[in-house]
Amino acid sequence: MSKPETTAAPNFLRQIVQADLDAGKHAKIVTRFPPEPNGYLHIGHAKSICLNFGLAQEFAGDCHLRFDDTNPAKEDQEYIDAIEADIKWLGFQWSGEVCYASNYFDQLHAWAVELIKAGKAFVCDLGPEEMREYRGTLTEPGRNSPYRDRSVEENLDLFARMKAGEFPDGARSLRAKIDMGSPNMNLRDPILYRIRHAHHHQTGDKWCIYPSYDFTHGQSDAIEGITHSICTLEFEDHRPLYEWFLANLPVPAQPRQYEFSRLNLNYTVTSKRKLKQLVDEGHVSGWDDPRMSTLSGYRRRGYTPESIRNFCEMIGVNRASGVVDIGMLEFSIRDHLDATAPRAMCVLKPLKVVITNYPEGQVENLELPRHPKEDMGVRVLPFGRELFIDAGDFEEVPPAGYKRLIPGGEVRLRGSYVIRADEAIKDADGNIVELRCSYDPDTLGKNPEGRKVKGVIHWVPAEGSVECEVRLYDRLFRSANPEKAEEGGSFLDNINADSLQVLAGCRAEPSLGQANPEDRFQFEREGYFVADLKDSRPGKPVFNRTVTLRDSWGQG
């Protein structure tokens, strides 16, 4: 794709916050990031994290991390730990202690009782299917539940018995009494509490009734003094309900909800259900597989926090739905690593080269810059009689325009001498296993006299180079819209069978032998790579390809 503009795109919420502060509405702003701990954060969450934490930073406010933990059956401490780690990795720190919606269960219960006493909530015995029938449709109004007119006393008694664990899961629910004829489906007597006999990771077995997201969210914002409650556009229709609860309860503050468009990235799936399916069915190695759209996956792939933050700044914040080209994200990491990643050489498909006219036993220590522009110092490569080049850099019958090594032809070894291919040694099956070459001793750092050498290839010394594993990652899906499957198919049909190639026996220059996990490099002529967070260790490195040097997919 063409190079995107790197300047920040418009952010309408920044203007709203500035206007509120200028008008003296708030002494300081307080935002929050409220994930449900039922999965790992993905690239879409990064936009929300950067927005909420970024606004708080920019305007000297606070940003809370609050886990919306109202569904214990799907939540786990593993996800809580991973979410906290991802936020810190992105470069943000929440204000104060971590918050949990479950911290407010006692207060939420007390407010539910107040709604019952005010005649604004009732206990309903309809099951899920019946409730769906009574609810109506977008074009037809709903019908009142036959239990809507229960007395306050009966509702208080039933709700207390629900809390005491007297009824099985799903037998009853507590619903708000709003308007079954409302064109907004969310106002048709929404559920406030469900019976769910499930152990909770924070509150244990104290509760067997749990509040709904809608009943929890706005009141939690009010308790925490959130000034700007920012969520994605799918919650726009929930805002009237958010405001109804705040208007009908004695909450300590009146937060305001704002919506922005979620991040939709092509070639990508961000549905937690689908990501979990990829993991559970073994299509990927785990939530942090480098092909996943999770932040832990991008981290293991070699993406930097700076590149993701810059990407989120580039795409901006607005209310228009659209699809962002994944090429913008790939541009962002290329741009950052081009400026920061030290250069190194790694031969992915080694072919041995013997330089026949180089003195046996002689070794020259050649100094090559770690970076062409930045002052990162030098690394030392021992140059001797035997070395490795990539098998793809020699062709006996070259295609048109081939500028690498051919029989009788010359190339320059990066940072070293010009060599000529004199003889190809083959095994019994006709495979080339070794090249015999000669070098021009007068070409170190300069062109040979009277002839032009166009090609430059990378190499590593045979002695001192490090054997390593290289994992060539690519996009997990071959379709720009993975969700779009043929009739009877699924998004799994769009998985890219070539999204991972594992190469064993690669040879890396000596300086890479002591690479620590998450050390990043540009492998010259190959791409940007990172030492794997889990599997790589000094002396036995494993490198993951973060991204190719150039966009090999083009406009998707």
Swiss-Prot record:
Recorded E.C. number(s)? 6.1.1.18
Catalysed reactions, as listed in the record: tRNA(Gln) + L-glutamine + ATP = L-glutaminyl-tRNA(Gln) + AMP + diphosphate
Q: Which GO terms describe its molecular function?
A: ATP binding; glutamine-tRNA ligase activity
User: Where along the chain is L-glutamine bound?
Assistant: D68, Y213
Residues reported in the UniProt entry to bind ATP: E36, P37, N38, H42, I43, G44, H45, A46, K47, S48, T232, R262, L263
What family does this belong to? Answer: Belongs to the class-I aminoacyl-tRNA synthetase family.
Protein name listed in UniProt? Glutamine--tRNA ligase
